[in-house]
Design a protein with these regions (language model features):
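Active-site core of glycosidic bond-cleaving carbohydrate-active enzymes
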Residues: 2-117
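General "foldedness" signal
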Residues: 30, 69, 82, 89, ...
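Detector for Asparagine
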Residues: 44, 56, 104, 122, ...
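Flexible loop/turn segments at secondary-structure boundaries
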Residues: 78, 130-132, 160-161
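Carbohydrate-binding surface patches
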Residues: 143-173
Length: 173
């Protein structure tokens, strides 16, 4: 279906980490990530149907900013159709307007902005650092999280070595 690496690169052992059968902190998770990155990807993205691959989830969990962003942009840029704002299923422009790809693009954007890890909520862990240039801000309003609706406002004041943030979520969750 477009590439012979599909079973290994997209539907293989990385799903054991994604489904938390293997803990992301275990050494074998790093081994799988390195193996996949070296043998199954080009520019940190799979050759076909890249939104099936879950190495980006592990990169986000581990706070690997540059690899995560490489995957994010090398996946989004060639698959997004600027005329329709939808995504192709394959790099060679077969099967347009795929809701699976569109939903996963949105989920990866969510992971970039906020991502739960057990009882911890990580905010802006793998965003491009330039998004927090002095005077810039990021706001999330009413986004859904495992902790209930979430409101976040972060304002950069890096000139004075600080970023100020306010976070509101349901304290009972």
């Amino acid at each position: 279906h477009g590439t012979f690496t599909v079973p290994d690169a997209m539907l293989g052992p990385m799903y054991l980490v994604f489904c938390e059968v293997i803990d992301p902190a275990e050494p074998v998770s790093d081994l799988l990530l390195k193996y996949h990155s070296e043998l199954m990807f080009q520019e940190n993205s799979t050759f076909s149907q890249p939104y099936y691959s879950r190495h980006n989830w592990l990169q986000a969990k581990k706070g690997m900013v540059k690899p995560f962003l490489s995957t994010y942009y090398h996946t989004m840029a060639p698959y997004a159709d600027p005329g329709t704002y939808t995504f192709w299923e394959h790099l060679y422009k077969l099967s347009p307007h795929k809701t699976h790809e569109e939903a996963n693009f949105l989920m990866e954007t969510r992971w970039m902005l906020y991502m739960e890890d057990a009882d911890t909520l990580n905010l802006f862990r793998v965003i491009p650092r330039r998004w927090m240039a002095d005077g810039d801000r990021i706001e999330l309003s009413g986004v859904q999280s495992y902790f209930g609706p979430l409101n976040v406002r972060a304002v950069s004041n890096v000139r004075n070595n600080r970023i100020e943030a306010s976070v509101r979520c349901d304290p009972a969750r």
